[in-house]
Amino acid sequence: MEQPQAECPAPSKTNSAETVESEKHEALSGPEKHPQDKDGADAAPEKHPQDKDGADAHGEAGKQKSGDQTLPPVQDGGNLECPPPEASSSPPGPACGIPSEVETTEACSRPQQLPQSPRIQQPDLDFYCVKWIPWKGERTPIITQSSNGPCPLLAIMNILFLQWKVKLPPQKEVITSDELLTHLGNCLLSIKPQEKSEGLQLNFQQNVGDAMTVLPKLATGLDVNVRFTGVSDFEYTPECSVFDLLGVPLYHGWLVDPQSPEAVSAVGKLSYNQLVEKIIICKHSSDSNLVTEGLIAEQFLETTAAQLTYHGLCELTATAKEDELSVFFRNNHFSTMTKHKSHLYLLVTDQGFLQEEQVVWESLHNVDGDSCFCDSDFHLSHSLGKSHGAEGGSGSPEKQLQVDQDYLIALSLQQQQQPQGMLGLSDLELAQQLQQEEYQQQQAVQPVRTRAPSSPGRGATSGRPAGERRQRSKTESDCVLL
């Protein structure tokens, strides 16, 4: 049974295929006819094509039919063997080691693609580490993720954990998506309609049914279609029923600036998908006005590719309620968001900060991605810099207090200037003005701060690890970090 494989590399495709077929047939049905091993392989192609199954009496035609039937049984990937004659009489594929044959290449390539499917790779993303944080005086779990996993599920579940609607055992360190979906399903089923009328109850039951249907999608991703008219404006889909039933607000900050009338006219009340279709139609139109409108709409999408505008950030800050927990959608990512003392923060769920107890929230105060890390009480976090920089432990409390005071002064300036600036300035100009004022405030206190530490202390800011997001320049951010 070992010898036929040694003879597979034949000079032609037809002889190679028929050699393997005939020798397999001889090995199982009539070994007494060919006591010689190698010589019999050369004589086999002309003797046995007629008596394989009775259906392939014309050689190549019968071999082609049987070749089509051999692909389904070959599904074991790297441990393939030649199939028995009753299952197939075609070339065995990878086990024969013929890289130049067309049939062999096709038979080998298909099983090798099977391990690449998302279903097989999904278990790698099925387990998530639990991070325990002090939240309003109680030890509370939040779920972290190591890669782009099911962020809608994690964003919603972290809200339920922070609201203490779902609790975990105190020693829980790892959780699966199935467990999270079970907890979420129990929360949905435990919701009772507030209205007792029959019509509203039927509508409520329909919403619950829709939510339970789309529940598995939370583990892979949701299809949401934003509208550029408001931070709460989304095209309604069954996926939105999950947020409605749980009472979790869903926000975005991708808004068109009302002080750009051309962009407002071009975008209108369309959703993202509708706007993309409009751009395609307008660009191929013979009407010059439509072409211009399409170009303006396309420019809006290109200049706001970050999916967060200054106008959207202002509206988001004004719309979100104090201490409200919500889900923020941006760049196809869902984050847990809250508002504390008139400022927005996103929950840090990166597994890289699993052991960083002082890194819980990340500020959201500009569109460029520059941010500050805070602990669970929204105090600026310096734990990352202490372990790597030149900051001494003796002055840490004083430095923390001084930085917090400077930050509060900057926030106070922003709140004082915002009503006046919004009367005649666009959102971008207002943001630049606020940043300039805060920069001047920082320069006023910086000489006092730089004289305190000795020369090695200059390494405090440069000693932050690469994983921490830092300010690109002091004039681009309204958050003061020293």
Swiss-Prot record:
Record's keyword terms, sorted: Hydrolase, Phosphoprotein, Protease, Thiol protease, Ubl conjugation pathway
GO MF: cysteine-type carboxypeptidase activity; cysteine-type deubiquitinase activity; K48-linked deubiquitinase activity; K48-linked polyubiquitin modification-dependent protein binding
Annotated InterPro entries: MINDY (IPR007518), MINDY_domain (IPR033979)
Family: Belongs to the MINDY deubiquitinase family. FAM63 subfamily.
Protein name according to UniProt: Ubiquitin carboxyl-terminal hydrolase MINDY-1
Keyword Phosphoprotein appears in the UniProt entry: yes
Pfam families to which the protein is assigned, alphabetical: MINDY_DUB (PF04424)
Stretches with biased composition (Polar residues): 106-119
Region (Disordered) location: 1-119, 437-482
Residues annotated as catalytic: 151, 333
Low complexity composition bias: residue spans: 437-446
Keyword match Hydrolase: yes
Residues annotated as site: Ubiquitin-binding: 427, 430-431, 434
Source species taxonomy: Eukaryota, Metazoa, Chordata, Craniata, Vertebrata
